[in-house]
């Protein structure tokens, strides 16, 4: 539904638009900064989608490349241990 002023009604949870963190800080995703990259990984070690991170498409692609490079350099794990594996 579009109103006369051209705005759209927000549906679902939250009404605030996420801002691309890298663009806001004026930096690029870097594979040598694993602490910053870990924030974009889920609990199982998978890369979070754009709708969860709020990154632009361009920065999401650069983030993916940086995470994959960090994984190959052994700075980040490929997968996180699951809860059942931790008991052993």
Swiss-Prot record:
Pfam families named in the record = Ribosomal_S18
> What GO cellular component entries does it have?
cytosolic small ribosomal subunit
Query: Which parts of the chain span the membrane according to its record?
Result: none
Ordered alphabetically, the record's keywords are: Ribonucleoprotein, Ribosomal protein, RNA-binding, rRNA-binding
GO terms for biological process? translation
Which InterPro entries does this entry report, sorted A to Z? Ribosomal_bS18 (IPR001648), Ribosomal_bS18_CS (IPR018275), Ribosomal_bS18_sf (IPR036870)
Which molecular function GO terms apply here? small ribosomal subunit rRNA binding; structural constituent of ribosome
- In which family does this protein belong, per the annotation? Belongs to the bacterial ribosomal protein bS18 family.
> Which PANTHER family does this chain map to?
30S RIBOSOMAL PROTEIN S18 (PTHR13479), SMALL RIBOSOMAL SUBUNIT PROTEIN BS18M (PTHR13479:SF40)
Q: What does this protein do?
A: Binds as a heterodimer with protein bS6 to the central domain of the 16S rRNA, where it helps stabilize the platform of the 30S subunit.
| Subunit structure of this chain's protein | Part of the 30S ribosomal subunit. Forms a tight heterodimer with protein bS6.
Q: What is this protein called?
A: Small ribosomal subunit protein bS18A
Provide the taxonomic classification: Bacteria, Bacillati, Chloroflexota, Chloroflexia, Chloroflexales
């Amino acid at each position: 539904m579009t109103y006369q002023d051209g705005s759209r009604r927000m549906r679902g949870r939250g009404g605030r638009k996420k801002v691309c963190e890298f663009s806001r800080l004026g930096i690029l995703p870097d594979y040598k900064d694993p602490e910053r990259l870990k924030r974009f990984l889920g609990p199982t070690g998978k890369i979070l989608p754009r709708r969860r991170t709020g990154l632009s498409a361009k920065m999401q692609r650069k983030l993916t490349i940086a995470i994959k490079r960090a994984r190959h350099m052994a700075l980040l794990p490929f997968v996180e241990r699951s809860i059942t594996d931790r008991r052993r």
